[in-house]
Amino acid sequence: MQGRFITFEGGEGAGKSTQIAQLTQSLQAHGVKVLCTREPGGCPISERIREILVTGQGDDLDGTSELLLILAARHEHIRQVIRPALASGHWVLCDRFEDSTLAYQGGGRGGDGPWLRQLGQWIRGDVFPDLTLLLDLDPTVGLARSKRRGGQEQRFEQEALSFHQQVRQAFLQMAQQEPQRMIPIDADQPVQMVAATIWREVEGRFFVSF
């Protein structure tokens, strides 16, 4: 079976990891080889970069340094994990990818969109999502969920609400620009309803007839 690359995008607390687990179960039940991964992270060096980016270790970073660390982590993630997995026929399900960079470092931080896209293309080369599932959620709801979850990875959650609103708008704008690839899904629903919507999209998109 041909490898597929499916990315999950959205703001904080949108439920990406939960829905990746749900889709993984559905695919594996039908004999699909699945690899789940995340960004930043996914391989040892990229996970070390993640620690800097999403915890208090990164508080002193400016926007340029933050971006360069993200791109370095992505380069190694693609090289070490994503490209080999796709070549071996796995379906790769990734929690965040290039769209998050455009939304957070572009929409949220105010970075130059065309320049970010150029850098992104240079880093990823021929690796590009077959499908992107955008879990859309009001930032006030998502941030409340994330706060209840707790943990040390709270650096971005501490940004102002206006930052997260800009991130959301950037995601939605990208979905309008690329409607064939990037599918917005209402994440303010019960987990199983969101999972069912995602499965219908995946099944229909790839003509899955198991």
From Swiss-Prot:
Record-listed ATP binding positions: 10-17
Pfam families: Thymidylate_kin (PF02223)
Enzyme category, top tier: transferase
Keyword Nucleotide-binding tagged: yes
Catalytically driven reaction(s): dTMP + ATP = dTDP + ADP
GO molecular function: ATP binding; dTMP kinase activity
Superkingdom of origin: Bacteria
Keyword Cell wall biogenesis/degradation: no
EC annotation from Swiss-Prot or TrEMBL: 2.7.4.9
PROSITE patterns membership: THYMIDYLATE_KINASE (PS01331)
Keywords assigned by UniProt, alphabetized: ATP-binding, Kinase, Nucleotide biosynthesis, Nucleotide-binding, Transferase
GO cellular component, one term: cytosol
Membrane-spanning ranges: none
A GO biological-process term: dUDP biosynthetic process
Family: Belongs to the thymidylate kinase family.
Function (record text): Phosphorylation of dTMP to form dTDP in both de novo and salvage pathways of dTTP synthesis.
Protein name, as recorded: Thymidylate kinase
Natural source organism: Magnetococcus marinus (strain ATCC BAA-1437 / JCM 17883 / MC-1)
Lineage: Bacteria, Pseudomonadati, Pseudomonadota, Alphaproteobacteria, Magnetococcales
